[in-house]
C-alpha cells in the first residue's frame, strides 16, 4: 500500500530551526572581513587536539621572550630563510637584550607563541606543528600585503544531465553481422537516452567552510563535486542551473581562475619514476606566487611548502622514494593517496573538492587528513567539500555542513550538528554507537534504515518522497533565505571579479596574460616541465639506457651486415639497403613514444601522461602545450646524442663513403628525420584517445611509409592510386637525399661487363645508367635511371623535411591543448543478449525489493548472535546460508616469523605471531599501516613467493599438505576477474575446478545457485563483469570475489583481505554481517578489516592486532561491547575508552597510528609479558594435544582426495580452454583488430605491388611484396602479448594460488585458442595479397602451397609471441625484445642483403632466421619458372664488332653458361642483353630454390614446435620455480659468474692482481 505524501512533523519543538536561523543570520550579518577571519577564528571544534586550544590561549595572553635555540647546521637553506623572515615580524615592540656572550635574543612572535628557531616551525623536525606554522605564515603574508583569493560557492537549481542507459549488451565477434538486423540500434535510437544525474540542488558554502558530501555509491556524489568545480566533461548542466563563486559566474571563473577551484579524483595519477619530493616540489613551483614573503626565491619558497605538506601528511620519510604505481615499485598505496592529497593542497586553491580521498587510509590517518583540511579552512579561508565513505564520528564532527544525496536527489543541506536531529524527527531511528555519517547514509538504504515505532507509515520511502519532504521543511526555507542573502552580498557583477583578478594578478609572474588562469608564464612552464622530464629520465635511467643500448646494438648489427661492401656496381643494391635501413631505423625508433600503455613511465609518451596532464591543466599548473613543448625540448639532446652514436657506427661500418662533407649531410638528414617522425608519432598519439587507436593507425602508417620510401617499390613502378603517398612521405625525401649524397660525383667499377671479353665500345655494364664502352658507372646516372633521383633535389628535400617538422610540431602542440577532455557517462551493467533478467529495471524501487521499512526490533537488522546452531538464519537478501558444509578442522599457527632480504640487508616483516581460527568464529586481523596484515594473511595462506618463513602452521595438529591451498578460500583485496565472463560463469568455473571430482557437475551448479542467493546476486547474476563504470560496480565486484571463493566450498577456512576497502558504510555492513552469518553456520573466517565502525567491529568474535614490524599487540576475544578487549588495554596503562568512542579507532590511537601518532607504551612488549599471551600458548598446546589424539583415533588416512588439484588434467584443460575461447569470442575489438590488420595490410601491399611485370625490378618488387607481408609480424605479436598477460595476471594472482588448475593447462589453453583465429587470418591475408600481386594464373598446387605457408606464418607469430611473453613481467618489456628479435629475423632473411654478400660471421644468422624459410617458400612458389623480361634501363646495350651479329659475338658467353638472354641475336648493332632469363635465376641469387619448398615448410613447423616447448620451459624456469620459492639454478649460475666477472674486472681496473674465485664448492652450493 502506497504511503501518504510525507509531511514535516508538527507539534514538536523546533529548536534546531531556531539555532540554524540564528547561526545563518550571525554568519551573514556579522561576518568578519577576510583579514580578521584569518586571525580571529580559533579551533573551537571538540575534536581538535587540546594542543590547539592551549596554543590559542598562549596567543591571547602573550608570553615571555626566551633564548632562541641555535638552528642545526643540517637545516635546509629555505628553512633558515623562512626563519629570518619570521624574525622581522613587528607583532611585538619589545626586543630582548643581548646576552653576555654577544648573542642577541631574537624577537618573539606573540601571534602564535613561537620563537625563531623553535622546531615547531621546521617541517623536517618531529616537533613541527602545522597549526602554528599556518597562523605564523598567514600573518607574515598579511604583514607583507600579500593577498590570497577567498571565495565561497552558491548553487541554485543545479541539475546535471548525462547520457547512457542503465544497461548495455555485450558485443561478440558476430555482433557486426547482426547489426543490420537491429536498425534501431544502428541508427542510435535508444542507445544513449538522456539521464538526470543531479536533480535541482540548492546550497551555499561560505568561504572557510567544510562541507561533507554523503551518499551511497551511484547517488551522484562525484558528479556533485565535479559540478562545483566545473569539471563535468561530457555531462551538461541545465540552463536554469546557477553556480557562482561570490558573484562570479562559473563560466568566467573557470576561464580566468581555473586553478582556484580544483577537484581531487578518487584515483591517483602520478609519474611513477619521480620521487615524492620531486612530485610535490613541482606542484609547489607551478603555483608559487610572484610576490612572496620578503622576497624569498621561488626555489626556497616552493621547497619549503612542499616540505611542510610532506610533514603534515606523514610523507617526510618518502622524500627520495619513487611514487611508483602498479608496475613500478614505490611508496605504498596509502602513501600514494597522501601524495595526491598534498599535491592538491599545494595548488593553493580557495575551493577544493575531495572525492573519497580517505580511501586506503586507516582511520587515524584519515582523521589527521581531515584535521589538516580544517586548519586550512580556519586559517586560510579555504572552502572544502569532501565526499567520504565510512567516516568516523570524530571526522564528522570536524565538518561545518553536510549534504545528503539519495539517487541523485538532495534530501538535506545544513549544519552538521542538526542533520541527525532532522532525520530523527523525520521518524528514523539511529542505533547506539552508529556514527552520524553512517546514520545519514543509512536512511537512503532501504535494507539498512530503521523507522521509529509509530512512524512506519509517515516516513518517506523513495528518493522522490525524501526530496519532497526536504523541500517542504523549515530547514530548506532557511537555506533558501541564506542563499538569497548570499546573492545579495555577492551579486552577479564585476566587483568581486575585479578583486579576484587583482589578487590573482598579484600572484602572476611577469609576461603572463592578465586573464590567464596560470600563475607562471609559458617559458617558466616549459622550463619547469623540462626539468621534470629529465628527472623522469633519470628516475628510469635503466630503461633509457637499455633502449639506447638496443639501438646501438642494431647499428652494430646493420653496419657489420654491410661491412666491406664493394665499391663496384655490385654494391649498388647494398648501398641502397644500408641507407634504407639507416633512415628507417632512425625514423621509426620514435614509435615507442606511442606505446606507453597509460603507465606514464616514459617522459616522451603523450598518451601515457595524458591523465596526469589533464589533472595538472585543471589545477592550472601549466598549459598542455607547455608540457608538450617541454617534452620536445628535453628529447632533442637525447635524440641528438643517440643519433650521433648510431649514425657514426652505421655510416662507417656500413661501407659508406668516408667523406666529412657527406657524413655531416648524412647525419643532418637522419637527425631531422628522427625529429620529424617523432613529431608525427607524437601528433598521432595526441590526436587519439587510446593507445590501441594510436597503434592501429601507426601500424598502417608505417606500412605506407616503408613501401613508399622508394627502395622497396621504385617510383616508376608505383601505381597512380597510391603514388600520392610518396609525395607526403618524409622518409622518401630523406632517402632520396641520402642516396644521391652517397653516390654523387663517384664512379663505380663495373662488376659484370657484358661480354666480359669485350673491348672498345663493344661491351656494356649490366646495370642501369651504364654507358657502352665504359668500365665504370656514374653514381648520379645510376640513381637517375633507377629511381629518377637528382642531386639537385638534396637541399630542396631538406626544406621539405623542415616544413614537415614545423607543421607536425605545430599540430602536435595544438592537438595537445585541445584533445584533453574525455566524456563522462553514467555507470551501467552489461548483459549478454537474451540474458537480461525479466524483472530488471535501470533504477528499480529498492524499497519494494527490501520488503518495506525495517523496525528497530526487526531481527534482520539486529546484530546476529554467535550461535552455531542457527542454521536457518537468513542472509541480508533473505536467503539461507545453511548450505555451508560442516567444518571441524582447527587451523593454528605458532611463532610465525617472516624474514626477507632488501638490498642485501635482512628485514623482519612478521615477528613470532601465534593464534588460531576455529570453525564458527569470525576473527578480525587489524593493525596500523605497514604492520604486515596482508603479509601475515599471505603467509598463513601459503601464498608468499620469497623470503624465509619459520614457525608452526598446523591443521588439527598436522603439518599442511599439498591440498591446503585448494581447501581454503582467499578473498583478495583486489577484485580480479576476467572482464568478459558473467557472474554465474565465474562462479561455475570456480566450482567446476575447485570442488572435488566426486561431486557431479549438476550438484556443483546447484550449489552455485545457492551461493548466488546467499549473496543476493540474483539481479546481476547474468551481468558481465566488465570494467569499472561499464560493468559491475565496486560492491558487486566485491560480492563476486567472495562468491568465487564460496563456490569452491572451502573445507578448512576462508581468508579475506580488506573485504570492505573502497565500500561505503552500508555496503561494508552488508559484507560483514554476511561473514557473521557464515561463521554462525560453521565457517571459519579470518579477515583483515579497514576502518571498521563500532557496529561492524562488534560483529567479530576475536581480534589479532599487529603493530609495526609485524609484532603482536593483542590476540583474544573481543567480548560483548568490546569489554574484554578494552579491559586488557586499560589494565595495562591505556586511557579509558569513552562510551561513544569506536573501540577500533581507540586501539589505533593508543598504539600511535597515523602520520603524527606516537605511543609512550611499547604494546608489543606488554603483550609478550602479559598473562593473555601465556594463555594463548597454553591454548595452542591444548588444541594440538586434543587434535593429535583425535588424529590417532582416526588414523592417518583422513584425506580422501589427496593431490594439489581437485580435478584431473583433461577436465582442467577443457574448462580453461572453453573460458579462453569465450573471452576471445566476447572481445570483438581484439579479433576484428587482428583480422582487419591482416586484411588492410595485405590489401594495401597487394595493390601497391599490383601485378608487377616480369622485369628484374618487377621480380625484385614481387620479392619485396612477400617481404612486406612478414612485417605484419611485429604488429601481431604486440596485439597478442597483452591478451596473454591479462589471462596470466588472473591465473597467477588468484587461480594458481588457489590451485584451481595447473600452469601447463594455462599455457596450452592460450596456445590452442589462438590457432583458429591465426588460421582465419592466414586465409584472409593469402587471398588479399597474392591475388592482386600475382593474379590468378598460378596453378592450384602453388596457390595451395602459398595458403599453407601463410597459415603457418601466422601460427608461428602467435606461438612466438607466447614464447617471448611467457617468462617476462609485462607486455612492454616483451614487446621491446620481440621487436629486436623480429628486426634480426627480417634483417638476415636474405632479401635486403644477399646471403653470398653476408660477412662470414653473420651467415649463420641467415640460416637460423625463421623468416628465411617463410620468404624462401613463398618466393619460390610464386616466381618459379617465371620468364624474365628486362626493362629498357636493365638491358646491357652495346655494338658487336664490325661484321658480326650479336649472336656470333656473344656465342662464347652463351657457351660458358651465362644466365642471361639475348633479345636481338641477328642484329649487327645495339645488342640487347638481359642478365637474367627466368625467375629461378633471380631467386638463386638469394639461395631460394623451388626444390626446397617442402623442406622449408617442415622447418617452419619445427620452429612452431620449438616455440611451444620454449614457452613451457621459459614459464617453468622463470615463473613457476620462482613462485615456488625454489632457487632458479640456471639464473643463479649466470648471476654468480657475472658477479665474479665484475670482481675480476674491478681488480684489473684498479691494478690489483686478484684471482677470480673459482672453487668448486662455491659453485656447487648453487647447484
Swiss-Prot record:
**Pfam family for this entry, one:** ABC2_membrane
Catalytic activities: voriconazole(in) + ATP + H2O = voriconazole(out) + ADP + phosphate + H(+); fluconazole(in) + ATP + H2O = fluconazole(out) + ADP + phosphate + H(+); (R)-miconazole(in) + ATP + H2O = (R)-miconazole(out) + ADP + phosphate + H(+); (S)-miconazole(in) + ATP + H2O = (S)-miconazole(out) + ADP + phosphate + H(+)
Region Disordered: which residues?
Answer: 1-37, 1172-1202
The primary location reported for this protein is: membrane
Provide a Gene Ontology MF annotation, just one: ATP hydrolysis activity
As for subcellular location, the record says: Cell membrane
- The source organism is Trichophyton tonsurans (strain CBS 112818)
Q: Which CDD domains match?
A: ABCG_PDR_domain1 (cd03233), ABCG_PDR_domain2 (cd03232)
PANTHER family, A to Z: ATP-BINDING CASSETTE TRANSPORTER
Q: Which residues form the ABC transporter domain?
A: 167-432, 891-1134
Q: What is the lineage of its organism?
A: Eukaryota, Fungi, Dikarya, Ascomycota, Pezizomycotina
Polar residues bias: where?
22-32
Membrane-crossing residue ranges in chain numbering: 543-563, 571-591, 636-656, 661-681, 691-711, 798-818, 1231-1251, 1257-1277, 1305-1325, 1345-1365, 1372-1392, 1498-1518
Q: Which UniProt keywords apply?
A: ATP-binding, Cell membrane, Glycoprotein, Membrane, Nucleotide-binding, Repeat, Transmembrane, Transmembrane helix, Transport
Q: Does the keyword tRNA processing apply?
A: no
Q: Which SUPFAM superfamilies match?
A: P-loop containing nucleoside triphosphate hydrolases
Q: What is this protein called?
A: ABC multidrug transporter MDR1
Give the compositionally biased regions (Pro residues).
Answer: 1-11
Q: What does this protein do?
A: Pleiotropic ABC efflux transporter that may be involved in the modulation susceptibility to a wide range of unrelated cytotoxic compounds.
- Reported induction: Expression is induced upon exposure to griseofulvin and itraconazole.
Membrane topology, from the record: Multi-pass membrane protein
Which residues are noted as glycosylation sites? Answer: 149, 157, 356, 819, 895, 912, 1253
Q: Which residues bind ATP?
A: 927-934
Taken from the UniProt entry, a GO cellular component term is: plasma membrane
The entry sums up its family as follows: Belongs to the ABC transporter superfamily. ABCG family. PDR (TC 3.A.1.205) subfamily.
